């Protein structure tokens, strides 16, 4: 069996056609590569999502924090950890709320899923985790997929994975909030979703004046 790197155009999760590199060995490996490409967003959309969480301003997004569950000591610790995460991500959430990019609503839904988590153990186990850009992209892709896939790894820091095991209604609500990138054949470009100023009609002088 050959193990050559092959580049080919492939349809991505966002509906865009992107050049992908396929390098897995054998026919089953090639199939796995194709399925992975189909289950992830294109490079341009990945960069769009990353830009959305970069350089937040000084704003803050109000979040209703649920009561944490666990032993008293764990709850106290988890509260501090969750508050630290909120201070870090709150300004980003405020920025997302103001953005017309359809991906912004999906990213905001991801963060809101995160802060709905009530398990003290989750916050403690992930106390060193930064919920960075790569995490955001993975979470948005989880929301966008019509069904689970075995070609993408799961991890314990995922809010999507947590709620898939605890309460699917939370995921359903997040998908509804992110419908602009889910219920579409192709995700619109960021510029296409931005409101444009109405054009003023050019009026010729009236002959009656």
What are these regions (language model features)?
Residues 23-209:
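Charged, low-complexity intrinsically disordered segments and flexible loops
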Residues 1-11, 66:
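Short acidic, Pro/Gly- and aromatic-enriched capping/linker segments at domain boundaries
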Residues 13, 17, 45-48:
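Cys/His-rich metal-chelating microdomains
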């Amino acid at each position: 069996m050959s193990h050559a790197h092959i580049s080919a155009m492939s349809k991505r999760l966002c509906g865009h056609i992107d050049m992908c590199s396929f390098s897995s060995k054998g026919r089953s490996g090639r199939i796995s590569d194709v399925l992975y490409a189909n289950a992830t967003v294109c490079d341009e959309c990945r960069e769009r999502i990353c830009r959305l969480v970069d350089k937040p301003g000084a704003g803050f997004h109000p979040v209703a924090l649920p009561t944490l569950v666990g032993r008293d000591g764990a709850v106290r610790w988890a509260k501090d950890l969750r508050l630290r995460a909120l201070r870090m991500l709150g300004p980003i959430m405020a920025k997302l709320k103001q953005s017309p990019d359809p991906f912004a609503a999906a990213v905001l839904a991801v963060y809101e899923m995160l802060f709905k988590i009530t398990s003290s153990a989750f916050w403690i186990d992930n106390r060193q985790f930064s919920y960075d850009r790569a995490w955001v992209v993975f979470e948005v892709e989880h929301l966008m997929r019509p069904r689970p896939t075995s070609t993408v790894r799961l991890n314990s820091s995922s809010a999507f994975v947590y709620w898939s095991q605890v309460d699917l209604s939370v995921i359903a609500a997040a998908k509804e909030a992110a419908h602009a990138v889910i219920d579409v054949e192709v995700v619109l470009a960021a510029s296409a979703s931005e409101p444009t100023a109405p054009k003023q009609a050019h009026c010729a002088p009236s002959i009656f004046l």
